[in-house]
Design a protein with these regions (language model features):
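Sec-dependent bacterial lipoprotein signal peptides
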Residues: 1-21
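Alpha-to-beta junction loops
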Residues: 112-113, 130-139, 225-234, 238, ...
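Bilobed "Venus flytrap"/periplasmic-binding protein-like clamshell domains
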Residues: 83, 95-108, 140-143, 159-216, ...
Length: 263
């Protein structure tokens, strides 16, 4: 999760709820949101982690800024198109996922009434911290650039993986992606990594990778299954979940790479 320097007390609250990450359903449901997309355009049964029994930590609650305490709400910004971490239910309004449940649990520890999650395009979340949102829990890979802007508290380590249409009809080779077309979400670590791979291809005298960024990860899946893109590159959790819900239309190729702490 990412938080502004002024709201660093959330780091303390995070310590109290991190064990939930080990037992929460990765398709858990939570609070309302606007925008985003349902997971891979398919339905999946979801079960929210029950945070009702999580006690308030009075020491932490005493540190909550007056503005946050007055609202009684821990406002989270997330790109609600990145299942199973954060995505929308079939009503296209209700945010769900393990990051969403973590935010609700944090709110309980801080003595607040609720933790809400609203959709925002991924690159806009960090600039909105401290104004529109109090916290950003949205599958951020920790980088030096992001740490310069926010405090970042990791509670999970996630890698990256490639997803292709079932049967890999375009013969995408994850060990040699030069000359291919790859869809990524804008502003992600995968976009940066794919850019580095493409530069290496050119340096080696090979064709560059055509990298096509999208604001929403869910927009990429039909491009892959329709063979417009050779592959998509995303968090390994996202690729695995997309494959599971794709009804046999998608598969993962290659190993998980670039495993890193995430918030």
């Amino acid at each position: 999760m990412t938080i502004t320097k002024a709201h660093a007390l959330i780091a303390l609250a995070a310590e109290a709820v991190l064990p939930l990450a080990d037992c929460a359903d990765p398709t858990s449901s939570s609070n309302g949101s606007n925008g985003g997309a349902s997971a891979a355009g398919t339905s999946a049964a979801t079960t929210s982690y029950d945070v009702s029994q999580i006690p308030t930590d009075e020491e932490i609650a005493a540190l909550v800024p007056a503005e946050v305490k007055a609202r009684g709400i821990l406002r989270n910004g997330a790109s609600a198109d990145y299942a199973p971490a954060e995505f929308l239910a079939d009503d296209l309004q209700t945010a769900q996922g393990y990051d969403v449940d973590i935010n609700k649990a944090l709110a309980k520890v801080m003595g607040l009434n609720d933790g809400t999650t609203n959709h925002a395009e991924f690159p806009t979340i960090i600039p909105a911290l401290g104004t529109k949102f109090y916290v950003g829990i949205s599958s951020f890979t920790i980088t030096s650039e992001r740490v310069a802007q926010t405090n970042m508290i990791s509670y999970v380590e996630v890698g990256s993986a490639f997803g292709v249409a079932a049967g890999n009809p375009n013969n995408f080779d994850p060990t040699n992606p030069c000359g291919t077309t790859i869809g990524v979400q804008t502003g992600t670590a995968q976009e940066d990594y794919a850019t580095e791979l493409s530069a290496q291809c050119v340096a080696d005298g090979l064709d560059k990778i055509t990298i096509i960024p999208h604001d929403q990860q869910t927009d990429i899946t039909p491009k892959v299954t329709g063979e417009q893109y050779d592959a998509t590159f995303a968090d390994s959790t996202v690729i695995g979940y997309t494959v599971t819900l794709s009804g046999g239309q998608m598969e993962q190729v290659g190993e998980v790479v670039e495993s890193a702490p995430q918030v």
